[in-house]
Structures are given as structure tokens and as C-alpha cells.
Amino acid sequence: MECEVTTVIDRPVSIVWDFFAVHHVENHPRWDPDIELEKATDAPIDVGTVIRRRSTRFETPTEGTMEITEFVPERIMRVRTQDGPMTINGWALFSTPSSGRTELTIGGEFPGLDDSMKKTILPLMERSAATIKSLIESER
């Protein structure tokens, strides 16, 4: 099953990229308070970076990792997340629909889940996208 949401943020792609991708570890818990992240090293995020994660979203907390699998500045960030026994392939796509605005599409592929789970996962992704938009537009 795949889920994907798109939002348009009234800021240039450089600012959205910096907030979402470059400072992902610091900012992800701000838009998704059910997630705690910690980089395994102090190096900047790039392909191969491993991030430890803990999710308290559902009844049983799960520990796992995120590995950056693609990192094209101001265009694409892809991750492979090991969330307990599940592997999730996630992405964030960045485009510029007009000057000073950024279209951010976030999505994930959730193998083994059927489409009935969309009603649980999609609202969480929509909440995250709305919070990302609000945080970026209010801070920068």
C-alpha cells in the first residue's frame, strides 16, 4: 500500500529543503510528536546516513532505523525505515510551482498493509504536512 500527500508552502525550496531534509533529525519530532530521532554520527545528512528512531504512535512503542537512500538537494529525499518488523520506503519530493513557493510531496510505501490501513495512515500524513507548512511559514 502507498500513501502520499502534497502541500504548497509559501517559501522558497531552499528554505523548505533546509527545514525538512538538512535538519530532519531536529525538526521531524516537531511535526510528528510520536517520533524521536537521533543520528548515529555527527556528519551532515546524506546518502547512507543512519538515524535511530523510536515511534510511540501505536499501542506498542517500536524502535528502528531510517537510512537515507537518496538525497538530491532541493529535489528528493528518500529513506528506508525499519520500524520494528516492517520496512517502509518513504520519500519527500520538492518542486517549485511558482516563484517563492514550494510543493512538498511526502509519501510512503507500506508493504504488507492493505488499502484499509489508508484511513489510519493518511490522516497522520496530512497532519504532518499541515504542521510542516505551518512551522516553516511561521518561522522563516
PLM segments and residue spans:
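Hydrophobic ligand-binding cavity/cleft-lining segments
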Residues: M1-D42
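Short, surface-exposed coil-to-beta transition loops
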Residues: E2-E4, P61-T65, M86-W91
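Glycine-rich portal/gate segments that line the openings of hydrophobic small-molecule binding cavities
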Residues: V8, E38-D83, P123, R127, ...
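A generic structural motif
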Residues: S14, P73-E74, S99
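Beta-strand/loop substructures that line and gate deep hydrophobic ligand-binding cavities in soluble
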Residues: R78-R127, T131-S134
